[in-house]
Regions:
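Short coil/linker segments at helix-helix boundaries
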Residues: 1-62, 66, 70-99, 249-285
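Canonical positions in the second alpha-helix
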Residues: 16, 71, 91, 125, ...
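Structural marker of alpha-solenoid helical repeat scaffolds
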Residues: 19, 74, 128, 162-165, ...
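Residue-level recognition of tetratricopeptide repeat
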Residues: 78, 98, 132, 166-169, ...
Length: 297
């Protein structure tokens, strides 16, 4: 209600401009008042910024978005005032308020939780270089809430390509990896994990990579990844346990084969030679896991 007069005046000015540009009785278009009307719109331009700021402070985020949006639309539709043009020419600067206007309009739309406003506004804001990390994070959150995995992936990939792989963009990279895993694209997931490791070699990444190699039955690579994880953090009980499980699973597979042996003597010999060594290999890993975390190991 506070800015109803400002909005109403803008509507009337637009209507007046439209009427002034209609052809006369002779079919000729000869605007009489357009210059004055546009000047009046220019005079009101900054008021929309002020209205946006006050609406934002009052937590009326939708109204703040609308006001900033009008602030951005006016120069697109009606150009900028002669006075403003002169100021910019003299200073030799670009008017950065439009960059900030797009940014704040996008944030206001995001906070309002109106996805239909927020997603296009955020996509417009990322065309500038101002605080793009926040813009990508907001977009990612909205796409995640909508369970839109195609756009989640696209926005994460764009963020990583634009800002490089670093601690700020790590979560985008992990999101891409998780989407690959969910879609059973294990090799792509491993390739992206390698990029994450190159940027920040965390033991957790090696652990995930080891599990992915297990998925594709590459136990040697899985063990190498788990060993690397433990080099970086020897207190990861679940990784010690995971390594024990690889040998335990091998023992189980061997026992399935050995159970087919009919001769008792042959069976006992095979068990001694093929299964027990694997259990003996698994045991120290489980013991280590238990010593670190007796509850969960």
């Amino acid at each position: 209600a506070m800015y109803k007069a400002l909005e109403d005046e803008y509507k009337f000015l637009q209507q007046a401009l439209y009427l002034d540009s209609l052809p006369n009785a002779k079919g000729k278009v000869s605007p009489k008042y357009s210059k004055k009307i546009i000047q009046r719109i220019h005079d009101r331009h900054m008021s929309f910024w002020d209205a946006a700021v006050i609406s934002y402070k009052n937590q009326d985020y939708k109204k703040a978005y609308e006001m900033w949006n009008t602030y951005l639309i006016i120069p697109e539709k009606y150009g900028i005032s002669e006075e403003k043009k002169k100021q910019l020419e003299e200073s030799g600067k670009v008017d950065s308020t439009y960059i900030f206007g797009r940014y704040y309009a996008a944030l206001a739309a995001y906070i309002s939780k109106d996805y239909e406003l927020a997603i296009p506004a955020l996509n417009r804001a990322k065309e500038s270089d101002y605080d793009v990390l926040t813009i990508y994070q907001c977009l990612n959150e909205l796409y995640t809430n909508q369970k839109d995995s195609a756009n989640m992936f696209a926005i994460s990939q764009e963020a990583v390509e634009r800002m490089g792989i670093n601690k700020d963009t790590e979560n985008f990279l992990l999101q891409m990896i998780n989407i690959y895993i969910a879609q059973d694209q294990i090799n792509d997931a491993i390739a992206y994990l390698d990029k994450a490791i190159a940027a920040n070699p965390r033991p957790e990444y090696y652990k995930v990579k080891g599990r992915l190699y297990e998925e594709v039955a590459n136990e040697a690579e899985a063990m190498a990844c788990f060993e690397k994880a433990l080099e970086l953090n020897p207190n990861m009980a679940d990784v010690w346990s995971e390594m024990g499980r690889i040998y335990y699973n091998k023992a189980y597979e061997e026992s399935q084969e050995i159970n087919k042996i009919k001769d008792d003597k042959e069976y006992l010999k095979a068990r001694e030679e093929r299964i027990f060594p694997l259990y003996r290999k698994a045991l120290p890993y489980y013991e280590k896991a238990y010593s670190i975390d007796p509850t969960n190991a």
